[in-house]
């Protein structure tokens, strides 16, 4: 018997995993709003960033989200990250908040989150409830430059 696989279209995947109006669909729409606000501020202040992980795959493969994806990830160089942490809290409207170690004394991650203040996520991870902000979010990861010798070494392994 021959093993056959079926290719699903983006529309079929969205209809199956994330129909318009579903909770996940609404969640994704709010993340897009967060990203658009983030993008506008970053452009205004010449802060560079890029999409990573499933967010990048979704943009390239699905022209949006991976249908079942419930988060969004961006990354930037450390120098841009530090600039962003200074600027973003002053420029966000009242429906959004930057959550990082500088803005939430209970937050312990080494990366920031741009949070929606009009929603509450129950992530069931045991620690989210201690954070000041708990809404829908975008993860913002800093990346550090490495010396050339370390880059060459990592390419050899």
Feature locations, PLM:
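Alpha-helical membrane-targeting segments
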Residues: 150-157
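Conserved catalytic core of two-metal-ion nucleotidyltransferases
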Residues: 9-43, 88-148
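Conserved oxyanion/phosphate-binding beta-strand-loop segments in alpha/beta enzyme cores
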Residues: 2-7
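Short, conserved charged micro-motifs
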Residues: 82-86
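Active-site nucleotide-donor binding segment shared across nucleotidyl transfer reactions
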Residues: 39-72, 81
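Short, flexible loop/turn elements at secondary-structure junctions
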Residues: 53-56, 78-80, 118, 142-144
